[in-house]
Amino acid sequence: MARQKKYSGKGGARKKNKQKQSVAPRRRVEFRYKGFTLEELQEMPIKKFMEIVPSRQRRTMLRGITPNQRKLVMKIKKARRLTNRGKEPRVIRTHCRDFVITPEMIGLTFGIYNGKEFKDVTLVEETVGRFLGEMAPTRAVVQHGSPGMGATRGSMFVPIK
């Protein structure tokens, strides 16, 4: 009598041993913003860059820059000169949350004020065309613990440990 195969109970079908296929590491796709590479964006004049950003950012840039934003631009240029010399620039601290991230700011570290403290953010390619304020949220989700004695009316009748 032929020997019966054991039923595994998983749909009745037997799994075949498949040979593991070697998976090649995924290549990182070259970053593009609206069809332009980062190098093209960095060489592009600011007027041309303004044409490809969304309308909200374009409107902000068209309105001009405030004195505080002008100081930030000077700090960015100074930090860019330091990186070109091979030195590591310090964190650029700023309160300007409404400043549009331009391609020349990529790679620099900013301390963006969120109303309480400066959040250190290193700008990467994907942040081009966004506002600095988007990188440092002003509100955090509060996770409360269990209420203490006297915190609620219902805790009046809870025995003290």
UniProtKB/Swiss-Prot annotation:
One cellular-component annotation, GO: cytosolic small ribosomal subunit
Assigned protein family: Belongs to the universal ribosomal protein uS19 family.
Keyword Transmembrane: no
Function: Protein S19 forms a complex with S13 that binds strongly to the 16S ribosomal RNA.
InterPro entries found in the cross-reference section: Ribosomal_uS19, Ribosomal_uS19_CS, Ribosomal_uS19_euk/arc, Ribosomal_uS19_SF
Compositionally biased spans, kind Basic residues: 1-19
Database matches in HAMAP family: Ribosomal_uS19
Record flagged with keyword Transcription: no
Gene that this sequence comes from: rps19
Region annotated Disordered, chain positions: 1-26
Name of protein: Small ribosomal subunit protein uS19
GO molecular function, one term: rRNA binding
GO biological process: ribosomal small subunit assembly; translation
Alphabetical UniProt keywords: Ribonucleoprotein, Ribosomal protein, RNA-binding, rRNA-binding
